[in-house]
Amino acid sequence: MDDFLEHLSKDDNKAWYGAEETERAAKLDAIETLLITDSVLKRNDVKKREKYLDLIENSGNNNGKIFVLSTSKITVSNLTNQQI
């Protein structure tokens, strides 16, 4: 998480935040590590939930590391509320 926040603050194009940006990175097979919150996997909108599951599958198929983060963690709450 610290590496992600560091790259995000440097704006060095090594970290993406948000669904659209992350999907673009996935299309380029540019995801080495995927951090995703458990809340997106619990959405009532089945199409959106399936989209995130596809993103996880794509990242895993390209040897990416996948971490599902609990939204109950304070750092995840801060990240979710961050204005970027």
Curated annotation (Swiss-Prot):
Superkingdom of this protein's organism: Eukaryota
Family: Belongs to the eukaryotic release factor 1 family. Pelota subfamily. Highly divergent.
SUPFAM superfamilies registered for this protein in UniProt: L30e-like (SSF55315)
Protein name: Putative pelota-like protein YCL001W-B
Pfam families from the UniProt entry: eRF1_3
Annotated GO biological process: nuclear-transcribed mRNA catabolic process, no-go decay; nuclear-transcribed mRNA catabolic process, non-stop decay; RNA surveillance
Organism: Saccharomyces cerevisiae (strain ATCC 204508 / S288c) (Baker's yeast)
